[in-house]
Amino acid sequence: RHYGYRIFTYQNIRDINERLYQYCRNYSEDAFRYGAKRIIAYDENKSPFRIRFSIMHELGHIMLGHSRECAYNEQQANFFASNILAPRMAIHFAQCRNEDDVSSVFQISREAGSYAFQNYRLWKESAAREVSDVDEAMYRHFYHDEREEFIYSIKPCMICGETIYNSSEDLCLHCRMEHIRRQHTPLYTSRND
């Protein structure tokens, strides 16, 4: 949306224009972009991980200025999506040990997690020799001075809305403790008078 594109599900497109829906479906089972109308559409029946990747893949085509389909452009769009969803530096600071960690922390498919982790290992070797200008800029952008740490994940607590940083938990520490306390509090107590 930031780039002026509207995002629709395939069902939304079908409700608006059956012909465009058929074109989307024939073009891709996952997602489609229509540059002239500034539209990205995706199949809402895919997994949430696949949807996120597909939308970022289409955004990659847009950001990289791709005007035609070819294998090289597809590789570039995949690389873009992978790095947007699981930046290699963020994989490092999240201390991911394998592709399952990457998939879990960054909410991407196992296949995407495997690709990202393999690429991370190459990045790590390169970064050990020399930190690139891009890496320095990324570090500055995601480093939180007050927290004194690199931030790779920000989300609100599902109960109180407090900001949770760098955690796979959906509840803040206070709400988790309250939840545990309630689970272990007896419904009634007996009195021995």
Task: Tell me the role of every PLM-derived stretch.
Residues 1-193:
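Active-site hotspot residues in diverse enzymes, especially metal/ion-binding acidic/histidine motifs
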